[in-house]
A protein has these predicted regions:
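Amphipathic, non-transmembrane alpha-helical segments in extracytoplasmic/periplasmic proteins
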Residues: 30, 39, 82, 97-125, ...
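Glycine-centered loop/turn motifs
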Residues: 49-57, 143, 188, 288
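Short beta-strand and beta-hairpin "edge-sheet" elements
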Residues: 56-82, 292-323
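Polar/acidic, low-complexity leader/linker segments enriched in S/T/G and N/D
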Residues: 1-20
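Short beta-strand-centered interaction patches in the first periplasmic/extracellular domains
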Residues: 72-79, 84-89, 127-203, 207
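Surface-exposed cap/loop segments at beta↔alpha junctions
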Residues: 44-125
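Acidic, small/polar-enriched beta strand-loop surface segments
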Residues: 1-4, 178-316
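Oligomerization/assembly interface segments of phage tail-like spikes and tubes
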Residues: 28-44, 77-87, 208, 268-279, ...
Length: 326
């Protein structure tokens, strides 16, 4: 892949070959640092072809690219950076139409839905695929940033946002996420894992106290079974019965008390974690794809979505690191 430097009108200036390091972050987060890039070059290289605010750096046929906004000169090094294409989406806010509480998408083909959310807010640089995604989506949005809105809308239908710069435009489209949980990334797959499970602060029995006083007070008892099921059926007492009290006198109904007790019991579940080193695996994961891991020693299994990709290009070559579930 070539890293291209272009003017504000996408007229190519140069194919970058002389630079110290390029690093770009693409993630599901919506803060600036979740989707930005930085290029480091020697001052002599920058002086030959200045990279200034409003210029673009990108790779054709990939998501990697964005707008130059920051230029910093430190010593003999010039650092240029800015938001990626994905980061530029996070800067736009979806406002409801006049007189309406929400911007509503109702049973619409996914790419048409993205187009309806984007509108003309991003100008001619961005386009939405006109292909039929085969997916129908819905959603309601009120003063939500565009990236978050598209992500949340697609995620509930097992889809993700794909972003590709085709050489002239940044093309957005909805595609199905890939679930790799059937291909567990265990040690047999040469995926280094670290796992842990903590029961010390976990509880499986809640006694929730609602309205009333003493014998008239509403009481709800719930138990969490080993498989995670929440039940009102009394379970055997003993050393494994770990109880706590939820004091909720402001619950307006028995249903609200039960709902709050259920939430607290879920929050008090054993904490299981498994770290998957995806960097050594020869799979081109996409944001939103789901990976599954199994620690063959402890037997612990878990699945997580890919939430971040970090591209780094330097003298040692090109490498993409992944993060899952964070």
């Amino acid at each position: 892949m070539e890293l291209i430097h272009a003017k504000a009108n996408i007229e190519e200036i140069q194919s970058l070959t002389e630079f110290d390091q390029y690093e770009a972050v693409s993630g599901l987060g919506f803060k600036y640092a979740d989707n930005d890039f930085e290029l480091q070059v020697e001052e002599a290289v920058w002086e030959k072809y200045p990279m200034i605010k409003g210029h673009y750096l990108y790779e054709v046929g990939t998501e990697w690219g964005g707008m130059v906004e920051d230029v910093n000169h430190v010593g003999t090094t010039v650092k240029v950076g800015g938001p990626t294409w994905r980061g530029m989406l996070a800067r736009k806010i979806i406002s409801p139409p006049a007189g309406q509480a929400y911007k509503a998408i109702t049973a619409m083909e996914a790419n048409q839905a993205i187009a309806a959310l984007v509108g003309t807010s991003l100008g001619p640089l961005f386009a939405v695929s006109t292909a039929d995604s085969g997916m129908t989506v819905s959603g309601s949005f009120r003063y939500t940033n565009l990236l978050a809105a598209i992500h949340s809308m697609l995620q509930q239908y097992g889809a993700r946002l794909e972003i590709i710069f085709d050489g002239t435009q940044v093309v957005l489209s909805a595609v199905s996420s890939v679930d790799y949980t059937d291909t567990e990334l265990s040690q047999e797959y040469e995926a280094p894992l670290e796992s842990s499970v903590a029961y010390g602060e976990a509880y499986n029995h809640v006694i929730a106290l609602g309205r009333g006083e003493l014998t008239e007070r509403e009481v709800v008892e719930l138990w969490r079974l080993d498989d995670g099921t929440i039940t009102t059926t009394t379970q055997p007492a003993g050393a494994n019965d770990k109880q706590f009290v939820l004091d909720y006198p402001n619950a307006e109904s028995l249903e609200e008390l039960t709902s709050s007790a259920t939430d607290k019991l879920i929050e008090s579940s054993p904490v299981e974690s498994i770290g998957i080193n995806l960097d050594e695996i020869e799979i081109d994961f996409k944001l939103g794809d789901v990976v599954g891991g199994r620690d063959k020693v402890t037997g612990l299994t878990i699945s997580k979505p890919i939430t971040q990709k970090i591209l780094k290009i330097d003298k040692n070559g090109r490498k993409i690191n992944y993060k899952a579930g964070e």
